[in-house]
Amino acid sequence: MARTAEVVRETKETQIRVWIDLDGTGASTISTGIGFYDHMLESFARHGGFDLKVETKGDLHIDMHHTVEDTGIVLGQAIKEALDGFKGVRRFGHAYIPMDETLTRCAIDLSNRPYLIWKVDFKRPKVGEMDTELFKEFHHAFAMNVGACVHLETLYGDNTHHVAESGFKALARALRQAVEIDPKTGGHAPSTKGVL
C-alpha cells in the first residue's frame, strides 16, 4: 500500500500544498519563497528518503514567520496522514549528524503525544535572510502536527548554517528510521495499548 498523502491548507496568511511519499527516493520540488528554507526542506527530503513537493505562498511582505510555521504544520499533517494511524512502523528513531565542526542529534518517538525538546543555539540572528529563531517554530509546528515526541540537540557547533542544516538532517534521518515498516508488528500500532 502506498504511503502517500497530500494536504492543502489556506488561511489569510498562507496558502500551502504538501505532497509526500514516505517510501520515495529523496526527490523534491520545494517553493516557499525563502531560499534557505527551501534548501533545508530539500535536505530533509533527501536524507529522509521521502519524495516531497511543497508549494507555499505566504505573507512575506510582513515577515517569514507564518510561511515557516504554517509549512511545518502542513508537512507534519501530511506525514501523519501518510502513516495511517502509525500502523506497522518502527515508531522510534535517532540520528547523530556531523557537519564539519557541528554535531547534532535527534531522537523521535511517533507516539501521537507531541512534544519538542529544543536545545539548539545559534551564534547569529540570521542565516541568509532567514531569522534563526524560526527554526524552533518549524520544528515545534512539525512535531505537534505529525504527533511526535522530538528531542533535538546541537552538542556543539559554531557555523549557523551548519547548526541549522544538521538539525534538519538529524530530524530526517531519525524520522526515516521511525517510519520504516517493522514486520514484527504484524501491521499493528507498536504500542502495548494497541493504538497510538
UniProtKB/Swiss-Prot annotation:
Question: Which InterPro entries did the record assign?
Answer: IGPD_sf, ImidazoleglycerolP_deHydtase, ImidazoleglycerP_deHydtase_CS, Ribosomal_Su5_D2-typ_SF
- Per the record, the major location class is cytoplasm
Ordered alphabetically, the record's keywords are: Amino-acid biosynthesis, Cytoplasm, Histidine biosynthesis, Lyase
Q: In which pathway does it act?
A: Amino-acid biosynthesis; L-histidine biosynthesis; L-histidine from 5-phospho-alpha-D-ribose 1-diphosphate: step 6/9
Q: What class of enzyme is it?
A: lyase
A molecular function GO annotation: imidazoleglycerol-phosphate dehydratase activity
* Location(s), subcellular: Cytoplasm
Q: Has the keyword Cytoplasm been applied to this entry?
A: yes
One cellular-component annotation, GO: cytoplasm
Q: Name one GO biological process term.
A: L-histidine biosynthetic process
Which reactions appear under catalytic activity for this entry? D-erythro-1-(imidazol-4-yl)glycerol 3-phosphate = 3-(imidazol-4-yl)-2-oxopropyl phosphate + H2O
Q: Which domain of life is it from?
A: Bacteria
> Is Lyase among the key words of this record?
yes
> Which E.C. number(s) belong to this protein?
4.2.1.19
- What HAMAP family does UniProt report for this protein, alphabetically? HisB (MF_00076)
Assigned protein family: Belongs to the imidazoleglycerol-phosphate dehydratase family.
Q: What is this protein called?
A: Imidazoleglycerol-phosphate dehydratase
Q: State the species of origin.
A: Caulobacter sp. (strain K31)
